[in-house]
Amino acid sequence: MRHCDSFCELIPMKGCEAMLEWMIDQGAGREPADIVLKGGRFLDLITGELVESDIAICEDRIVGTFGTYRGKHEIDVSGRIVVPGFIDTHLHIASSQVTPHEFDRCVLPQGVTTAICDPHEIANVLGAEGIRFFLDSALETVMDIRVQLSSCVPATHMETSGAELLIDDLLPFADHPKVIGLAEFMNFPGVLAKDPECMAKLRAFQGRHIDGHAPLLRGLDLNGYIAAGIRTEHEATNAEEALEKLRKGMYVLVREGSVSKDLKALMPIITERHAQFLALCTDDRNPLDIADQGHLDYLIRTAIAGGVEPLAIYRAASVSAARVFGLFDRGLVAPGQRADLVVVDSLEGCHAEIVLSAGRVVSEALFAARKPVAEVGRNSVKAPRVTASNFRSQSNSGKTRAIGIVPGKIITQNLEFDLKVGPNGVEPDLERDVVKVAVIERHGKNGNIATGFVHGFGLKAGAIASTVSHDSHNICVVGASDEDIATAANRLGEIEGGFVVVRDGKVLAEMPLPIAGLMSTEPYETVREALRKLRHAAEDLGSVLEEPFLQLAFIALPVIPHLKITDRGLVDVDKFEFVGN
């Protein structure tokens, strides 16, 4: 990306009372605009045309297009194309393992000027304090971070979280200027059963935006769920499911994260006809993938390479996304719109060269001027120390359920294996890629430990462990030996949470995440390289997964079918009940 530090430093901020007059004069060409982008073309998302025109900016607004303008500061964008800033409509910033300030530095230069986040992860650990941390951060970031209030903390009664958020805990935040509405309503069984607390939250936010989360929900049950006032869905994993939800009035957020990769499957619905009802999201994407592939820019160029019309995907990335969430001040290159702009090399390449956020040219100087936000959630890992004996199965039967990993998906399979029973109970079968999985309660509530088996990691030795474990973020460990499972779990307690790879009792790689056991205090570049080392260490153990730690993070999520494990035991998500090994 090309940086233009001097522009944002030289433009004076004017008094608000004179703003309207200045915008009118600059838009009408009577006065020089604050900034003019000259020599390029912009993508008109209404007609689909590439328009040769100057773009005039006054303060944080576009004031002129389809004309020639004089500027106090002029930026030559000859040979390039200007598009509206990209909007990520559903993500968990904590899943990037960096703070909101570092997320800002990481993705804004890629063209993401607005991010609509759910602080669900930190809320499950810290409760209202975690939401407050995100709102305070959102007031300081250069990009516009909007917050959806976490609706399901905990996600279900089938796990132990660090906190619980009832409607009375959410209402004090409802009128915060950065709050849009209610985040993904994962407890769709609770909605359909008219659970009193679910009803209280839904009633309180009627008329405001309520995000959905209803994987594989179809037919009349889907109708009932939508009738509760829920507007969007990011869990559609195939075109047929997405089309049903579109036909029933939902907006579909097309997701491509580090684990959940649904873009290819949903490409058939990304058309000019459907684009006004679509948006893009990443849900969970880590800095390593952002560095190696990109963020929403990656989704855009991947979709176009797959045959999607550029107009359709750029509409979904900006104007359609803005309309879905009621952000009518952005999404177009047009007068009166917020000056969130991305200068790209081409529509197909979508490589950001210059980014403007609210009329400011993005630069390191702009990031350096932000006010810091105090850290929260230190020393949050309060798990009991464990030994190998804590993970030994006492079953006398070799017939054992196993969680089946589906690469690139967070949906799992409900499998059964006939495993060998040894002196320490049921044993892993490395030849058939069946190893142990354990979840350890880490909030200091009850010390629960649950064990089971998982198929699909490819481990031949050692263990990998994490405190990033949706949604309650207890310790989750997968390993080929009980001893290494214990070593990895104990190490997480020593480093305040994070990721660990262990073999033969030795730590091969680790990354501390001391902010609530979820986020690093380091710059995103440091996190990126630590993730690279962790991925290589997991590969050395035999892991066959592209993103083993985020895949691990979803094993304990009991709102995504089909078989999961929490600190309380194995969960058959289809029946929403605990099941034996």
UniProtKB/Swiss-Prot annotation:
What is an example of a GO molecular function annotated in this UniProt entry?
adenine deaminase activity
Cofactor (UniProt): Mn(2+)
Which keywords describe this protein according to UniProt? Answer: Hydrolase, Manganese
Reaction(s) catalysed (UniProt annotation)? adenine + H2O + H(+) = hypoxanthine + NH4(+)
EC number per UniProt? 3.5.4.2
Q: Which GO terms describe its biological process?
A: adenine catabolic process
Keyword Manganese carried by entry:
yes
Q: Transcription regulation: is it a keyword of this entry?
A: no
Which HAMAP family did the record assign?
Answer: Adenine_deamin
Q: Which family does it belong to?
A: Belongs to the metallo-dependent hydrolases superfamily. Adenine deaminase family.
**What is the protein name stated in its UniProt record?**
Adenine deaminase
Task: Tell me which species this is from.
Answer: Brucella abortus (strain 2308)
Taxonomic lineage from the root = Bacteria, Pseudomonadati, Pseudomonadota, Alphaproteobacteria, Hyphomicrobiales
